[in-house]
Amino acid sequence: MNEPAMNRSEGRAIFGLDASDYDIARMGYPAQLYDAIAARTGGSLAGRSVFEIGPGTGLVTRELLARGVERLVAVESDPELARLLSALAGGGDRLHVVNAPFEDADLGVDRFDVACAAASFHWLDTAPSLAKVHAALVPDGTLALWWNSYRNPHHGDLFAAAVLPLMAGLSFPPFQSAESHGSHDERFWRGELIRAGFGSIDHELVRAERTLTTAEVRALFGSYSFIRRLDREARERLLDAIALLAEREFGGVVPNVALTASYLCTAGPR
């Protein structure tokens, strides 16, 4: 979808370098998404066993714990993020953090009711990772994949369109480019899920509009892996240019279109 693409192993190691700033100016996920997952498990996540791929700073982890999951295995490849996750309040004996790449992670012998991956599955090799997920779920278990995208120039996002020239020459994560986000490619994800043995696939795209300050825009772009990977001088130069654009062209009142793309599906017969 884009070239050149960031190396997957590089991308996985970036976010733990500055975990405290990752969530600044990023949104949570719609409550209706968690409700939809719960609906597939009898109406509630309470008492369910769940594993989460790439929990990062624990945004989804905290919500799952709050909804009463009985067992939550969080598979996080970054050592610093794994350390922070282990200290999450309310986890107790219900939360077990596995610090390993998902491909190498030992999920144990007990199968799970639900698997979740929020803004992380693009860092994995799709086909073998889906196969591992399928094998780890109980029959008719639920897989939920979802992403937030904040640069949507083809969905009425004026600032995302205006900033495109500044994105030239950058290397983006797998399934992303300066103009598009791979989570919107419904045909691709449906095909991969079907080939991996999943069915009853529901796809939803939820739109949210908000206004950001210049400081929030700078923080948002500064949280992107394709900008974090730059050397300090190049990174600051680019972020300065983005902030200048926000001030000069938008008066520091920057429109932002955020899209949440989700795929919920059921593990079919093995």
Question: What do these predicted regions represent?
Answer:
Residues 28-47:
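Conserved alpha-helix/loop element of class I SAM-dependent methyltransferases that forms part
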Residues 51, 57-105:
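Class I SAM-dependent methyltransferase SAM/SAH-binding core
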Residues 183-270:
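Conserved Class I S-adenosyl-L-methionine
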Residues 134, 138-208:
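Conserved catalytic/acceptor-binding region of the Class I
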Residues 124-133:
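A short, conserved alpha-helix within the catalytic core of class I
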Residues 16-27:
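Class I SAM-dependent methyltransferase Rossmann-like catalytic core
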Residues 119:
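Short catalytic micro-motifs in class I SAM-dependent methyltransferases
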Residues 105-115:
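A short acidic, Gly/Pro-enriched loop at the edge of an enzyme's catalytic core
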